[in-house]
């Protein structure tokens, strides 16, 4: 992941851009490469599909009950709820989303342009991120809306659009009370394409290093991308007094508790480090596992297709059919009248006979084939007329 962070920015050598400030230096050194952002967005979109794949193929398939089925049915709802808590924690703590943080990405507020330019010019700006460039509450809410709420609403609207489209295909009646559905079919795809085009234009501006935003909402609310930097605290004065008191402390319960708390504070940092190492590995293993299972399923399907292509054995024939097959010219003669077939039809057993002969024979012989003597499924007995009837036992041939 750190490979992309070490790539030189294409806009660092450009001068006189719209983001330029003092001495011709702009905000280009702050922006990451487009590869980092696209990789992060791709993983963010693949993560729910991968988790649902594991849930459906292992938990639901091995333990099918009403709880696991409901868990799979309402997957998008509870997954978005959990993701919302995780994303809000990371936005509040790190000014970054869960996936972006593992790619070394961070969001900052570009409303104070002079402070951002000072951060580029000041060599010490690489050490910590000032409070004025951190996201405010409104900008964090916008990112939460873009990452959590809007994808959920879009997914539900896509489902409604698909249902309405399918209903219009299979139902031809159009009444006046369906005008909201017709308006939705016209307006929603147009708005969706318009937003996609707007996001594409913002990405083109990002490629030209005119902005650090990659979406329309980020561009409107002055939210831009940068690489991860430590955030400065509002109470930075406490850092100067920390560690100055080297006097002996009293060994009472409070001091012992404070000492243990200080020693245990390393656990969250350790868990964060392990998570940063485990998450990329988990994503890689998950993709390999999906590829492996897909290849295995493809092999099984190909094997089944090959088994179907094998020669199908002929069905067993009765002694009467064997005698009939030995007769000369049986393939061109009707098995009932033993003459040349006129007005041909085919029976369920695959043999051809004259249509009048076949009807007469089947009715008088309780629906049995004249060649194999097998009962035809298309011949039924009518209890009202006390006669056998040919329903679907034969088919006319057009020659």
UniProtKB/Swiss-Prot annotation:
TM ranges: 34-62, 68-92, 137-168, 172-208, 278-305
Annotated residues for binding of Zn(2+): 334, 337, 354, 357
Key words, A-Z: Membrane, Metal-binding, Peroxisome, Protein transport, Transmembrane, Transmembrane helix, Transport, Ubl conjugation pathway, Zinc, Zinc-finger
Low complexity biased stretches: 9-24
Subcellular locations according to the entry: Peroxisome membrane
InterPro entries, A to Z: PEX12, Pex_N, Znf_RING/FYVE/PHD
MF-aspect GO terms: protein transmembrane transporter activity; ubiquitin ligase activator activity; ubiquitin protein ligase activity; ubiquitin-protein transferase activity; zinc ion binding
Pfam families, alphabetized: Pex2_Pex12
Pathway: Protein modification; protein ubiquitination
Membrane topology: Multi-pass membrane protein
Peroxisomal matrix side: 1-33, 93-136, 209-277
Keyword presence, Zinc: yes
Primary localization: membrane
One Gene Ontology term from the biological process aspect of the record: protein polyubiquitination
Disordered, as annotated region: 1-24
GO CC, alphabetical: peroxisomal importomer complex; peroxisomal membrane; transmembrane transporter complex; ubiquitin ligase complex
All ranges on the Cytoplasmic side of the membrane: 63-67, 169-171, 306-399
Zinc finger boundaries on the chain: RING-type: 334-373
Further comment: Present with 907 molecules/cell in log phase SD medium.
The record's note on its domains: The three subunits of the retrotranslocation channel (PEX2, PEX10 and PEX12) coassemble in the membrane into a channel with an open 10 Angstrom pore. The RING-type zinc-fingers that catalyze PEX5 receptor ubiquitination are positioned above the pore on the cytosolic side of the complex.
Family stated for the protein in its record: Belongs to the pex2/pex10/pex12 family.
PANTHER family tied to this protein: PEROXISOME ASSEMBLY PROTEIN 12, PEROXISOME ASSEMBLY PROTEIN 12 PEROXIN-12
Quaternary structure annotation from Swiss-Prot or TrEMBL: Component of the PEX2-PEX10-PEX12 retrotranslocation channel, composed of PEX2, PEX10 and PEX12.
Stated name of the protein: Peroxisome assembly protein 12
This protein's encoding gene: PEX12
């Amino acid at each position: 992941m750190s490979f992309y962070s070490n790539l030189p920015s294409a806009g660092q050598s450009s001068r006189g851009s719209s983001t330029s400030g003092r001495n011709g230096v702009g905000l280009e050194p702050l922006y990451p490469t487009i590869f980092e952002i696209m990789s992060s967005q791709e993983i963010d979109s693949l993560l729910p599909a991968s988790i649902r794949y594991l849930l459906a193929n292992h938990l639901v398939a091995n333990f099918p009950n009403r709880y696991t089925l409901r868990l799979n049915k309402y997957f998008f709802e509870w997954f978005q709820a959990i993701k919302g808590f995780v994303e809000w924690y990371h936005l509040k703590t790190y000014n970054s989303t869960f996936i972006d943080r593992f790619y070394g990405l961070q969001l900052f507020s570009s409303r104070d342009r002079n402070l951002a330019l000072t951060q580029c010019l000041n060599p010490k700006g690489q050490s910590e991120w000032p409070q004025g460039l951190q996201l405010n509450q409104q900008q964090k809410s916008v990112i939460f809306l873009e990452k959590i709420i809007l994808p959920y609403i879009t997914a539900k609207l896509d489902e409604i659009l698909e249902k309405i489209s399918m209903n219009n295909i299979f139902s031809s009646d159009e009444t006046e009370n369906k005008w909201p559905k017709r308006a939705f079919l016209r307006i929603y795809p147009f708005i969706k394409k318009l937003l996609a085009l707007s996001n594409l234009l913002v990405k083109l501006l990002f490629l030209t290093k005119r902005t650090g935003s990659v979406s329309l909402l980020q561009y409107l609310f002055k939210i831009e991308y940068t690489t991860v930097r430590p955030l400065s605290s509002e109470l930075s004065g406490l850092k100067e007094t920390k560690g100055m008191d080297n006097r002996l402390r009293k060994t009472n319960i409070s001091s012992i508790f404070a000492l243990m708390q200080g020693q245990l504070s390393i656990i969250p940092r350790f868990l964060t480090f392990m998570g940063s190492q485990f998450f990329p590995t988990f994503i890689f293993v998950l993709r390999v596992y999906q590829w492996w299972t897909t290849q295995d399923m493809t092999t099984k399907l190909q094997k089944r297709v090959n088994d179907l292509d094998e020669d199908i054995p002929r069905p067993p024939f009765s002694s009467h059919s064997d005698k009939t097959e030995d007769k000369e010219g049986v393939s061109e003669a009707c098995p009932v009248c033993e003459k040349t077939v006129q007005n041909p039809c085919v029976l369920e057993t695959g043999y051809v006979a004259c249509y009048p002969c076949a009807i007469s024979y089947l009715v008088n012989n309780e629906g049995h084939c004249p060649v194999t003597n097998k009962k035809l499924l298309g011949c039924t007995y009518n209890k009202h007329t006390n006669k056998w009837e040919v329903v679907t036992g034969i088919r006319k041939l057009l020659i």
